[in-house]
Swiss-Prot record:
UniProt note: domains: The TXY motif contains the threonine and tyrosine residues whose phosphorylation activates the MAP kinases.
Active site (record annotation): D141 (proton acceptor)
Pfam family, one: Pkinase
Regulation of protein activity: Activated by tyrosine and threonine phosphorylation.
Example GO BP: stress-activated MAPK cascade
Major subcellular location class: cytoplasm
EC primary class: transferase
UniProt modification remark: Dually phosphorylated on Thr-171 and Tyr-173, which activates the enzyme.
Annotated protein name in UniProt: Mitogen-activated protein kinase hog1
PROSITE patterns membership: MAPK (PS01351), PROTEIN_KINASE_ATP (PS00107), PROTEIN_KINASE_DOM (PS50011), PROTEIN_KINASE_ST (PS00108)
Origin: domain of life: Eukaryota
UniProt catalytic activity: L-seryl-[protein] + ATP = O-phospho-L-seryl-[protein] + ADP + H(+); L-threonyl-[protein] + ATP = O-phospho-L-threonyl-[protein] + ADP + H(+)
Entry EC no(s): 2.7.11.24
Protein species of origin: Aspergillus niger (strain ATCC MYA-4892 / CBS 513.88 / FGSC A1513)
């Protein structure tokens, strides 16, 4: 039985195993607090994310379950990796991942980025997205603060808690609006991997300019700003709008022509502008895919088709449409024990999954 130690961080109780010491707050999100810590077993710094009250509602239970399954499934150099999971006696859940020193948002607000860093960061973002998309996963909330970077400029995409959620209420968040694809704003329902390419394009443009490309005050203003640069959406895109109110709004906007991006990004490499043109396309079907973007001339210094892997298998989304009570979502506890046992099997050559899972399920029965 693990020994738990309590600490107060920003008025929040962190109840973690004694394996992790030297807690320091590094970030606070809508669904949890993140601290840095020292792993006494490995001697390495780690990030410990507390999911507060994960079983308080069915929605939050499902969200936590989704993030856990995704972190277990997605194994890639440009995706944050999960090293430990535990549930405290207070029934809070803690995810332990590798610790990276900063994120892209902090970098962008501290200094302009040189060309080689912009290239390398974009390459790694797209390399990660190629893998994620091949697994049948849409991140959906890609933004600079979800892109972690260490002192060696290694980059990892994090925060998959919102992946593949189709929830219009989430679209009101100011922090994510700037990077949101137009098809999400226009239809609020059907979208696919192309939304992440749009977000990556907005991040790319921000790296080039040092400021957000589409800093809308609200969704109406956001869409107007987009059309000022990219012109009025094509008729076939407008025809996909499902909301009558949105359709009336779009048709009421003045007709605008697409502006050459070279006129806005005057100091950028022509190859950078060309790639951005291919990423910032209204019609998602015509937007460049991650694998195609990796092969673009702008990323030639880093592109290596033999080292840009795809997922071995698709992610199992069968649970995602389930509308279950909190007690049923507590099956995630068995997943946590399963994760530990798989790691132990890799180290010690033995698996004790079945008994541990049974014990975990009984504990929450």
């Amino acid at each position: 039985m693990a020994e738990f130690v309590r600490a107060q961080i920003f008025g929040t109780t962190f109840e973690i195993t004694s394996r992790y010491t030297d807690l320091q707050p590094v970030g606070m999100g809508a669904f949890g607090l993140v601290c840095s810590a020292r792993d006494q077993l490995t001697g390495q710094p780690v990030a410990v994310k507390k999911i507060m009250k994960p079983f308080s509602t069915p929605v939050l239970s499902k969200r936590t379950y989704r993030e856990l399954k995704l972190l277990k499934h997605l194994r890639h150099e440009n995706i944050i990796s999960l090293s430990d999971i535990f549930i405290s006696p207070l029934e809070d859940i803690y995810f332990v991942t590798e610790l990276l020193g900063t994120d892209l948002h902090r970098l962008l607000t501290s200094r302009p980025l040189e060309k080689q860093f912009i290239q390398y960061f974009l390459y790694q973002i797209l390399r990660g997205l190629k893998y994620v998309h091949s697994a049948g996963v849409v991140h959906r909330d890609l933004k600079p603060s979800n892109i972690l970077i260490n002192e060696n400029c290694d980059l990892k995409i994090c925060d998959f808690g919102l992946a593949r959620i189709q929830d219009p209420q989430m679209t009101g968040y100011v922090s994510t609006r700037y990077y949101r694809a137009p098809e999400i704003m226009l239809t609020w329902q059907k979208y696919d991997v192309e939304v992440d390419i749009w977000s990556a394009a907005c991040i790319f443009a921000e790296m080039l300019e040092g400021k957000p490309l589409f800093p809308g005050k609200d969704h109406v203003n956001q869409f107007s700003i987009i059309t000022e640069l990219l012109g009025t959406p094509p008729d076939d895109v407008i025809q996909t709008i499902c909301s009558e109110n949105t359709l009336r709004f779009v048709k009421s906007l003045p007709k605008r022509e697409r502006q050459p991006l070279a006129s806005k990004f005057k100091n950028a490499d022509p190859d950078a502008v060309d790639l951005l043109e291919r990423m910032l396309v209204f019609d998602p079907k015509k937007r460049i895919r991650a694998g195609e973007a990796l092969a673009h001339e702008y990323l030639a210094p880093y592109h290596d088709p033999t080292d840009e892997p795809v997922a071995e298998e698709k992610f199992d989304w069968s649970f995602n449409d389930a509308d279950l009570p909190v007690d049923t979502w507590k099956i995630m506890y068995s997943e946590i024990l399963d994760f530990h046992n798989i790691d132990q099997a890799n180290d010690a050559g033995q698996v004790l999954v079945e008994g541990a899972v049974a014990d975990g399920q009984q504990a929450f029965a």
